[in-house]
Regions:
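N-terminal non-globular leader segments, chiefly Sec-dependent signal peptides
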Residues: 1-67
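Short, compact, well-ordered microdomains
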Residues: 57-88
Length: 88
């Protein structure tokens, strides 16, 4: 299972307002999802700063997996999502 553990901008600055919004108004933050949602698919769910909504995004630019940390790093057009793989 996967858990979103952080969101930053492309310079690595934590997006506090984004995280706060997602934590308080959308069920995606801190919830668990199967890997299929993120890996091997051309989209993920991202917070859009302009509309203030979670959107299904097709703008993944790059993703990587850090095996020792069991951490997926997903880069979109304007954010980087850190998604931790947890034992079920």
């Amino acid at each position: 299972m996967l858990k979103i553990v952080g969101v930053t901008d492309l310079d690595g600055v934590v997006k506090e307002e984004t995280i706060k919004y997602i934590e308080t108004t959308h069920s995606l933050y801190g919830k668990f999802y199967s890997k299929d949602l993120f890996v091997g698919m051309p989209f993920c769910f991202v917070y859009d700063d302009y509309s203030g909504q979670m959107l299904r995004s097709s703008t993944i630019c790059h993703w990587d997996y850090v095996e020792k940390d069991k951490l997926y790093i997903i880069e979109t057009m304007n954010s980087i999502y850190y998604i931790k793989e947890l034992e079920e």
